[in-house]
Amino acid sequence: MEDNQIELITRMVLNVLQEKQSGKTGFAVPVGVSARHLHLTQDHVEQLFGKGYELTKKKDLMGGQFAANETVTIVGLKLRAIENVRILGPVRKASQVEVSATDAIKLGVKIPIRESGNIKGSAPIAVVGPKGAIYLDEGCIIAKRHIHMSPTDASTAGVKDGDIVSVKVDDERETVFHQVQIRVDSSFTLEMHIDTDEANAAKITCGQIVTIL
């Protein structure tokens, strides 16, 4: 056997061993980039838009959610504001505002990184609509990056709900995201969700494919 053939085979074997040691699954996932948005209770919708008001649908999203036509302005403690923040429906039991770290700097608010729905002790924020305003003592977070999966996808990838994985972006910036949470539900479509800061840092666009390590 020629020396170059031996070298090639050796390299291939080493690559396989390295992948096994790192626990690489090779499972491919498309990326969705989430811009700042918020979820509201029906009571808060009415305080912002008027009594009896209901959100109107702009675009369907996964899991029965939708992007609403309605937008609001969010205001930090130093009266720094960000306008045209889109509401996602349907209404929830608790209102929640999700922003990026860059948004947090602009708002002048120290905002924790949290899983969606985990708002206890999170940052305060004011929300202003065309008919009124509300003040949330807590509810503003930077959403923890995560992957939505169906049970079938999770089984194929060898992961379960709540698992934490690392994900590699194979582009010119060769980025690896750690601390990516797996979220499994039968209503979910396979997609990794990151915010605009994370997407810009890794030069990722919506629909780009990444790989679970």
UniProtKB/Swiss-Prot annotation:
Predominant place of localization: other
Full protein name: Phosphate propanoyltransferase
BP GO terms, sorted: propanediol catabolic process
Binding, Zn(2+) 2: 146, 148, 193
Superkingdom assignment: Bacteria
Family indicated by similarity: Belongs to the PduL family.
Domain notes: Formed by 2 beta-barrels, each is capped on both ends by short alpha-helices.
Residues binding Zn(2+) 1: 37, 39, 98
Annotated cofactor note: There are 2 Zn(2+) ions per monomer; Zn(2+) and CoA bind inbetween the 2 domains in each monomer.
Task of the protein: Involved in 1,2-propanediol (1,2-PD) utilization within the bacterial microcompartment (BMC) dedicated to 1,2-PD degradation by catalyzing the conversion of propanoyl-CoA to propanoyl-phosphate.
Keywords: Acyltransferase, Bacterial microcompartment, Metal-binding, Transferase, Zinc
